[in-house]
Amino acid sequence: MTTRTTGLPRKDLFDIPSDIVYLDGNSLGPPLRGSAQQAVEVVSDEWEKDLIQAWNSANWMSMPRIVGDQIAPVIGVQPGSVAMGDTLSIKAYQALAAALDIRPDRRVILSDSGNFPTDLYIAQGLIDTLDRGHKLATPPPDEVEEHIDEEVAVVYLTHVDYRTGRMHDMDAITKRAHECGAVTIWDLAHSAGAVPLEMRQTNTEFAVGCTYKFLNGGPGAPAFIYIRPDIVNSIRPALTGWLGHKDPFAMDLRYDPAMSTERFRIGTPPVVQFKLLHFAMKIWDLVDMSDIRLAATRLSELFIEEVERRCPILDLVSPRNASNRGSQVSFASDEAYSIIQALIDSGVIGDFREPNILRFGIAPLYLDENDMVRAAETLEHVMKAEIWREPKYQVKKQVT
Ligand SMILES: *Cc1c(COP(=O)(O)O)cnc(C)c1O
């Protein structure tokens, strides 16, 4: 995996059953070919043979830093500025606690009503824990900018809306926030690996994201947090675990944070997950994000056109203008849940989101025009033949 190519898709790099069209890589990316072997090797070559020594001999303890340096170019930041571990919910908590600490005199956390629930729950929980009278404001996404004022401590937003794919103008919002003296946190859950990002240029203080969506790190893959390097050493981490200490193995009784991004580490890294993510990240040496974006736009437009022509009863809820949309396309229907279940049974995997959304992730790494047309044709068949009416498609599963 060394030469870059503009050739997309790269289906050859993935293990996806050939009879399905996978439009859910925005929720769980598929495995890269060879992922299973990676997991086997960690267990049989490293853990089994070296036991505890593998923390050194197989570089286990350095995996968070190594993988953080693979994430950095994908989100447009400098090496050494990304800490890895835990889940996105926890990284969001760390960022938010730190941001509130930077603006102790202000009380408003500004998010929006389209944000992913966990981001909002984390804020609500932190507000309760701090008990200092903070308020969470959640105006509609298109009104966020006008709510930024001198009361706002932190602007805490998800760049690409998980339901509709609507994309915030990150540069404009960050600039406005900074003009008002607010700190910014961008959640890149649906952006990293999907759209070109230049987080360093935005000058945001924090960015967080997960790696099991468009970065294909596998279920439970560790999350990331970027902290602007000029402020990282003045930040008091909220979750002060031993691996964020400046010398974990000194076993000091007093917490003293690492003088680097490492202070945002907490505890023992999930090594198997890290190795899988490390392997999956190699793909970004082969492809260019601007090519990905171009291809995603082309595929999305084709899909919208095909679906609207074949299923006019479905309403597009994603922005029609590609520049305001991330890498997903969503439609609304009262029967969205049943339609998606019937579609999945017919080999086209998308997903359902409350209250009435059919959601399709467009990942050009492993999707082409034929896949888009086949997905639209299958959707048309499910709708016209009313296959979704079958009782088995009405039953709600635990994970939708
Ligand atoms: C997927 C997603 C999450 C998931 O958080 P986890 O802690 O990894 O479960 C959080 N926020 C957003 C915006 C997401 O899209």
What residue spans do the PLM features occupy?
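Pyridoxal 5′-phosphate
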Residues: 1-400
